[in-house]
Amino acid sequence: HAELLEQVKEDLKKEGIDLKIVIFNDYVQPNMGLKDKSLDANFFQHVPYMDDFGKKNGFEMSAVGNIHIEPMAAYSKKIKSLNELKDGAEVLLPNDPTNLGRALIMLDKAGFIKLKDNTKLDSTVQDIVQNTKKIKFTTLAADQIAPRLGEVDAAVINANYAIDTGLTTADAILIESKDSPYANIVTVLKGNEADPKVAKLVKALQSEKIKKFIEEKYKGSVIPAF
């Protein structure tokens, strides 16, 4: 995300906007920064996560622009395809409600497990109604999964953490479909949707220049969503 913002920093300067980029290593502080008004906008989440976070923390946010999708994927150091998973194998999944549901829906759509309802975005391991291989699903914080990939049979990893550890979708044994509702968005506190600074930021991020940058740099690990 920061890389994309760096790409538009100079363009925004010409528009009279001094873009200050603040990098966080978790999924909580960027939203709390909107709430306490220390940030004008953030760029890290998708709508299901934003809605869930707002509900739990008692404030509303708005999505003001889709920028890209980071397809979630399953990886393994031990097998080359999901079908090779042995009975009772251990698979790591992210533990926050949105990404856990997202991971389970991906596994359901691949025919690997069956969920009670594969449109329910906040499905949990308890919603699995068919697990023929008796896979042991362990849930962990999203940022802790990639470092532990070697200890388990397979793991579902968010693209940003996969990229950080040098994994690409070419290494994946399963990739989420491109029509996922999980595009990364620019987010503001509800009521600030008309902020002209933010409108210019979104316009810069949805430019042809950024589209090209995403396609050339990430080669499918990240895809434009505009």
Where are the model-predicted features located?
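Short, polar/charged alpha-helical segment
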Residues: H1-K20
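Short helix-initiation/N-cap motifs at beta->coil->alpha
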Residues: I21-M32, T119-P147
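Pocket-flanking alpha-helical
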Residues: Y27-G58, K80, A162-G166
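Alpha-to-beta junction loops
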Residues: K35-Q45, A89, F112, K133-K136, ...
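Ligand-binding "clamshell"
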Residues: D52-V64, K78-I79, E151, V156, ...
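A conserved helix-loop-strand patch within extracytoplasmic ligand-binding domains
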Residues: V64-I113, K211-K212
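A bilobed periplasmic-binding-protein/Venus flytrap-type ligand-binding module shared by bacterial periplasmic
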Residues: P71-L82, A183-D195
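Periplasmic-binding protein-like
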Residues: G101-D108, L205-A225
